[in-house]
């Protein structure tokens, strides 16, 4: 497969996007830091105004402390060493609000972390690799271009 173990990224969608962005922002050593992150309609924040309630409750309980909310609101954990990101979402996603991705993207830019974001007008949530997603070809082509040319390793 020609995989270079020194150049490994992480990909996650929805709650898996929270897991991926948590690894990208909470790593404890250079060896555990991914080199890039690919996030599809990710849960990012634990802020009650924008989070996915089920993900929040499963991760940090129904009545979490302010410290726990901040710790797992990954847009607040971005720093200059956070790995570069490819983010894709739909503006009509009602399950995981677009603010999750948008605020994370803005945090990446604030810390000069290379990032690209693709927002599709329709698709809702959970489109992944579904053939009936109108923008499937577009987002997979954009991801391939980014992986081949945009990722700085």
Can you name each region flagged by the protein language model?
Residues 81, 86-89, 93:
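Short beta-strand/loop motif that positions the catalytic acidic residue
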Residues 14, 43, 91-93, 121:
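Residue-level signal for short, function-critical loop segments
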Residues 38-40, 86-88, 118:
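Hydrophobic/aromatic beta-strand patches that form the interior of the parallel beta-sheet core
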Residues 42-77, 83:
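Mobile cap/lid helix-loop segments that gate and shape the active-site cleft of serine hydrolases
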Residues 102-153:
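C-terminal catalytic histidine-bearing segment of alpha/beta-hydrolase fold enzymes
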Residues 8, 85, 115:
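Hydrophobic anchor at the start of a short beta-strand
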Residues 94-103:
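Conserved alpha/beta-hydrolase "acid-adjacent" motif
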Residues 1-51, 69-70:
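Primarily recognizes the serine-hydrolase "nucleophile elbow" in alpha/beta-hydrolase
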């Amino acid at each position: 497969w020609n995989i270079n173990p020194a150049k490994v990224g992480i990909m996650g969608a929805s709650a898996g996007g929270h897991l991926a962005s948590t690894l990208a922002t909470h790593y404890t050593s250079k060896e555990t830091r991914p080199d890039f992150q690919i996030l599809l309609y990710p849960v990012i924040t634990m802020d009650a105004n924008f989070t996915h309630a089920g993900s929040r409750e499963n991760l940090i309980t129904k009545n979490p402390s302010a410290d726990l909310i901040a710790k797992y609101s990954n847009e607040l954990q971005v720093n200059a060493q956070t790995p570069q990101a490819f983010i894709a979402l739909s503006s009509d996603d009602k399950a995981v609000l677009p603010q999750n991705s948008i605020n994370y993207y803005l945090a990446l830019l604030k810390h000069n972390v290379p990032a690209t974001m693709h927002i599709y007008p329709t698709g809702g949530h959970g489109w992944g690799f579904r053939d009936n997603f109108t923008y499937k070809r577009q987002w997979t082509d954009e991801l391939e271009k980014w992986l081949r040319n945009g990722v700085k390793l």
